[in-house]
Amino acid sequence: MLTPMVAGGVVFPGLFLLSKNTLQRLPQLRWEEADAVIVSARLVSSVQAIMASTAGYIVSTSCKHIIDDQHWLSSAYTQFAVPYFIYDIYAMFLCHWHKHQVKGHGGDDGAARAPGSTWAIARGYLHKEFLMVLHHAAMVLVCFPLSVVWRQGKGDFFLGCMLMAEVSTPFVCLGKILIQYKQQHTLLHKVNGALMLLSFLCCRVLLFPYLYWAYGRHAGLPLLAVPLAIPAHVNLGAALLLAPQLYWFFLICRGACRLFWPRSRPPPACQAQD
């Protein structure tokens, strides 16, 4: 178990540092540290997402029996990804800190900042990214132990499908980069926004009904009968995982309304949301 976790603890921070230093030091680029940190953090998140979704696809398509079939990659990648969530909490804080500095709320260097300003930035970070930090902490403290201990080698198919939820992450990361650099008017941003909306809907929101349907097909049950046929704690866990996805999907839909129908002429649906 330790080998994949150690590997993850080296790969993700190492990739971040490599990307940041490359963007800062290449003569053709010479990016500012803030820009290099933000883009590097998004790059690492995208790489992790591609790796996770690829592993998930391999596992889910290899498990013909959705309960009993096993694939070594399910446990190996789960262990490998644990350090990513810990790293990403810190990487998100670095992005928030640099954005705070760029906006002019801090001094030009660390010594120039007022006492307590770092704590104020940390509180602002936790306030703004509370749900994401909570999600990452739950992945490490709850989901990982459950996947290793409670599953007892069962349900690799379902774990593979859950890993494929990361398909939407590269589009989310690219969208954030384009917004950060005021590229909302570009065709790339609009195409990426449409792909982000579609991938998030299919791979994160509709994923849960699909998993219930897959189990119902395996057990010979109609979809609506599945929640009553499985343990209550499974339904509770699915609801807790689905809830933040629905919230984030709402934010994506609201952003899509503002992108494709500016406020000067919003459609009735957007007016109702505003």
Swiss-Prot record:
Listed transmembrane segments: 130-150, 159-179, 194-214, 223-243
The protein's enzyme class: transferase
GO BP field: ceramide biosynthetic process; lipid homeostasis; negative regulation of fat cell differentiation
Tissue expr: Expressed in testis. Expressed in the retina with higher expression levels in the macular than in the peripheral region.
Catalytic activity reported: sphing-4-enine + octadecanoyl-CoA = N-octadecanoylsphing-4-enine + CoA + H(+); eicosanoyl-CoA + sphing-4-enine = N-eicosanoyl-sphing-4-enine + CoA + H(+); sphing-4-enine + hexadecanoyl-CoA = N-hexadecanoylsphing-4-enine + CoA + H(+)
Keywords associated with the record: Cone-rod dystrophy, Disease variant, Endoplasmic reticulum, Golgi apparatus, Lipid biosynthesis, Lipid metabolism, Membrane, Transferase, Transmembrane, Transmembrane helix
Enzyme Commission number(s) from the entry: 2.3.1.-
InterPro entries cross-referenced by the UniProt entry: TLC-dom, TLCD
Domain TLC: start-end pairs: 34-261
Cellular component, GO, one term: endoplasmic reticulum membrane
Gene Ontology molecular functions: sphingosine N-acyltransferase activity
Family annotation (Pfam families): TRAM_LAG1_CLN8 (PF03798)
PROSITE patterns: TLC
Disorder named in the UniProt entry: Cone-rod dystrophy 22: An autosomal recessive form of cone-rod dystrophy, an inherited retinal dystrophy characterized by retinal pigment deposits visible on fundus examination, predominantly in the macular region, and initial loss of cone photoreceptors followed by rod degeneration. This leads to decreased visual acuity and sensitivity in the central visual field, followed by loss of peripheral vision. Severe loss of vision occurs earlier than in retinitis pigmentosa, due to cone photoreceptors degenerating at a higher rate than rod photoreceptors.
Function: Involved in ceramide synthesis.
Name the record gives this protein: Ceramide synthase
Provenance organism: Homo sapiens
